[in-house]
């Protein structure tokens, strides 16, 4: 059996190529500890961020997730109610509550001056997390549409041996 996940590669390409957001030496806060986060932590570690912190409603799940990547960088975990006072450069939302009408009022004690917020969820309207982020001083925000497109291109490359161009697809879908 051969299996691939394109969550990490799709996210990285969207962050770095489409959005121009660097993550090397960044403090990254991940909200949620589900399957999508499992798929992206490894890829984020490869970019050598300063730190990655996973915060989840169920604290034990956050710790279980970072244990999978021990020795891959500075990884810490907590509940959503105990996020460290670190100047977060990038906050990535993977909470299932983001699919609902509102986003939970999570206290993020410190943001970097140029903090960015990224929602793994995508929509033709601002997601609940993007609206929440806009109201809390994030300088840049994006939903996960670019990640979805980049994942599709990576999957196509796995099956067909060549990676299709994605910039035009993303531009068309954003208009």
Mark where each language-model region is.
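Rossmann-fold NAD(P)-binding glycine/threonine-rich loop
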Residues: 8, 102, 107, 115-166, ...
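Rossmann-like NAD(P)-binding element
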Residues: 58, 82-104, 118
């Amino acid at each position: 059996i051969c299996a691939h996940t394109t969550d990490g590669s799709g996210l990285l390409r969207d962050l770095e190529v489409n959005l121009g957001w660097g993550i090397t030496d960044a403090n990254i806060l991940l909200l949620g500890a589900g399957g999508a986060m499992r798929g992206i932590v490894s890829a984020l570690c490869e970019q050598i961020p300063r730190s990655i912190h996973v915060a989840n409603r169920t604290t034990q799940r956050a710790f279980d997730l970072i244990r999978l990547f021990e020795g891959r960088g500075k990884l810490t975990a907590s509940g959503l109610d105990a996020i460290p006072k670190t100047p977060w450069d990038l906050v990535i939302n993977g909470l299932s509550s983001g699919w609902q009408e509102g986003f939970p009022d999570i206290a993020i004690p410190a943001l970097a001056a140029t903090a960015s917020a990224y929602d793994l969820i995508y929509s033709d309207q601002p997601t609940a997390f993007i609206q929440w982020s806009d109201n809390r001083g994030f300088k840049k925000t994006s939903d996960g549409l670019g990640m979805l497109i980049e994942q599709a291109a990576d999957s196509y490359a796995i099956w067909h041996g060549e990676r299709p161009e994605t910039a035009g697809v993303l531009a068309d879908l954003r208009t």
